[in-house]
């Protein structure tokens, strides 16, 4: 069974009944329950469609954070061959929250950077829940510089609530590391494609998302601050995150309307976790199309178009 979100309770109840009936039918060797199971399956599918047809921004935020959602390493494993990760920032340490390296996409050598949240307690702690430290962003800069030197397209996967805000990170220059990574993105003379696959939070996200083409999964979110953080600032009450989300325009649909992103990648009904392979493959199709569209554009033009793109965002919102 799936991990159900609170607003999915009607579906959870129905799918629980379906599983019980299937188990009972198997134990009794009965085929008489087939009609009842089919009826409940239709009710469950209809309920899921009804819920996902009218999702609120806060509900989309919860889907973006779903623990079973496909994460960066799953995209890398399925979309790229010969992936070779690089470790360390040549200054302090390696940061497992930020994955980076080189591989082949449909046979083409590319550079890859992404934030990894982890999928269970052990890996979440290992990857610091996707919140990168300064050494993570400095590692990203290493990869960007190498991509530019060897003229390799850069593909990034964004999935973070934000950069790690701890004292140790601040002592090691978190703000400088984020700023430098953002600036490095703007200097690259290669195609840069960024996919927001879950949460895109604050400077921790934008540091690897200043791209020629930016796409979001259908139920991902992208904002300068989390709904909880905004609620704490505006109303001194983080429990009003739902109200904040409704006013922040954090959804893929809002950001496409604002011309901040270039497109939306559809998710299976019920979210990406209900069809991981299909949504990863759809992401691969978008990456392939984007690379084709930039194949004949020279490096200086790519750089200037990217800079202009983000200047326009600042002027228009």
UniProtKB/Swiss-Prot annotation:
GO terms for molecular function: acetyl-CoA carboxylase activity; ATP binding; carboxyl- or carbamoyltransferase activity. Residues 40-293 form the CoA carboxyltransferase C-terminal domain. It catalyses: N(6)-carboxybiotinyl-L-lysyl-[protein] + acetyl-CoA = N(6)-biotinyl-L-lysyl-[protein] + malonyl-CoA. The lineage of its organism: Bacteria, Pseudomonadati, Pseudomonadota, Alphaproteobacteria, Hyphomicrobiales. One of its GO terms (biological process) is fatty acid biosynthetic process. Keywords: ATP-binding, Cytoplasm, Fatty acid biosynthesis, Fatty acid metabolism, Lipid biosynthesis, Lipid metabolism, Nucleotide-binding, Transferase. InterPro entries: Acetyl_CoA_COase_a_su, ClpP/crotonase-like_dom_sf, COA_CT_C. This is Acetyl-coenzyme A carboxylase carboxyl transferase subunit alpha. Acetyl-CoA carboxylase is a heterohexamer composed of biotin carboxyl carrier protein (AccB), biotin carboxylase (AccC) and two subunits each of ACCase subunit alpha (AccA) and ACCase subunit beta (AccD). Pathway: Lipid metabolism; malonyl-CoA biosynthesis; malonyl-CoA from acetyl-CoA: step 1/1. Its EC number is 2.1.3.15. The keyword Nucleotide-binding applies. Its main location: cytoplasm. Disulfide bonds: none annotated. HAMAP family: AcetylCoA_CT_alpha. It is an enzyme of class 2 (transferase). Component of the acetyl coenzyme A carboxylase (ACC) complex. First, biotin carboxylase catalyzes the carboxylation of biotin on its carrier protein (BCCP) and then the CO(2) group is transferred by the carboxyltransferase to acetyl-CoA to form malonyl-CoA. GO terms for cellular component: acetyl-CoA carboxylase complex.
